[in-house]
């Protein structure tokens, strides 16, 4: 029985998480009383486990800490046992330990390098919370902060010839804004691209495959484009060359041009053979954006004037959607399908403009009618007042 209980080990893999109180240090030393207090909120405690599930009892009520190099195997003793784990949740994965051994961390730990991450560094040791708990270090909004405890520390990274800048770079990216500002937990964080238990940097040739997990259409268009063979021949990473890796900023339409040192201008000037195509696509996007902005402004004015402009709003949404498609179509590196997408968007924007103009014209018509009616009523009241005055005078 004790052997079975011991198997559960640190279910941080399973329900993945760690106590926020341990976030200051990856694996701090705690007293027995502190550990017991933390353990009251632990997923293992909720499952009926006790200290001896992970610890050998040393003296009295004191427990020996597991050897650092043995922690992954200790956790894996439960988390690779499918028949044991399914009693807690039949859908839980049981391949975390084998995956860890394929990771950069796991390969180093098997060589005796103890400065790399083990289970308790990310999930904690006591007070482990569910991965669905927003307080957990491995909850999506906290993952980058957890990774940064090591990967933003030059003292930890320098011995491995690794930069300590990726966490800061990611924090300024569109992905970080989506995750941290809009609380979009589907937005990518460290583990989305690098993996969690099998964490490793994607190889150059695999970067596009990672990005394609979310950016499906962009990847498909690029693979069919003339740039694909060129990038392969130069061993250039597909997505990273233009978008970077961690510090991915929001793309701008101005990238489709020859100004500055980003986008097309990073490699080309306007003397290239396809310059006219690039300029044409850029004009199509600029015209579409201008039409969308004008329609949005006029529809807003009509709406504030009390007009119902549902059709115009629907057309404006369609125009905005087509602009998104047109921007994605840049990855085809050809005049089409961007021009078609932009043309469809422009048509919708023009419908929105027409609806807005009709509504504004109706507003003016009503105002003129109101003005005429007001003048008529005012004239009537003045005439009536004069008539009453004459009657009062006996005239």
Task: Give the positions of each predicted feature.
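Short sequence/structural segments immediately N-terminal
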Residues: 22-383, 391-394
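Bacterial N-terminal signal peptides that target proteins for export
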Residues: 1-14
């Amino acid at each position: 029985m004790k052997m079975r209980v011991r198997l559960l080990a640190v279910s941080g893999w399973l329900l993945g998480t760690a106590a926020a109180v341990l976030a200051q240090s990856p694996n701090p030393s705690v007293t027995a009383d502190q550990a017991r207090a933390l353990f009251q909120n632990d997923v293992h405690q909720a499952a009926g486990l006790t200290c001896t599930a992970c610890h050998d009892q040393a003296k009295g009520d004191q427990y020996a800490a597991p050897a650092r190099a043995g922690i992954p195997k200790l956790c894996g003793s439960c988390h690779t046992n499918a028949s044991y784990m399914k009693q807690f949740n039949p859908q839980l994965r049981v391949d975390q330990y084998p995956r860890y051994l394929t990771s950069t961390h796991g390969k180093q730990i098997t060589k005796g390098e103890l400065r790399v991450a083990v289970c308790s560094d990310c999930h904690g040791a006591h007070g482990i919370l569910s991965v669905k708990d927003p307080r957990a270090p491995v909850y999506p909004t906290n993952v980058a902060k957890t990774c940064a405890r090591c990967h933003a520390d030059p003292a930890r990274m320098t011995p491995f010839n690794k930069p300590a800048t990726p966490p800061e770079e990611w924090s300024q990216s569109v992905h970080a804004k989506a995750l941290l500002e809009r609380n979009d937990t589907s937005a990518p964080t460290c583990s989305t691209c690098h993996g969690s238990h099998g964490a490793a940097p994607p190889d150059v040739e695999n970067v596009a495959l990672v990005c394609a997990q979310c950016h499906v259409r962009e990847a498909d268009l690029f693979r069919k484009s003339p740039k694909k063979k060129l990038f392969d021949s130069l061993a250039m990473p597909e997505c990273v060359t233009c978008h970077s890796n961690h510090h991915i900023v929001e793309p701008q339409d101005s990238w489709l041009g020859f100004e500055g040192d980003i986008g097309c201008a990073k490699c080309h000037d306007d003397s290239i053979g396809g310059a006219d195509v690039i300029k044409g696509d850029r004009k199509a996007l600029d015209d579409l954006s201008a039409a969308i902005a004008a329609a949005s402004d006029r529809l807003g004015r009509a709406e504030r004037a009390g007009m119902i402009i549902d059709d115009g709003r629907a057309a404006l949404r369609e125009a905005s959607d087509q602009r998104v498609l047109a921007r994605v179509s840049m990855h085809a590196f050809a005049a089409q399908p961007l021009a078609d997408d932009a043309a469809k968007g422009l048509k919708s924007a023009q419908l929105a403009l027409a609806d807005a103009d009709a509504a504004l014209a109706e507003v003016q018509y009503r105002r003129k009618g109101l003005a005429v009616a007001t003048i008529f009523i005012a004239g009537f009241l003045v005439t009536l007042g004069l008539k009453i005055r004459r009657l009062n005078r006996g005239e």
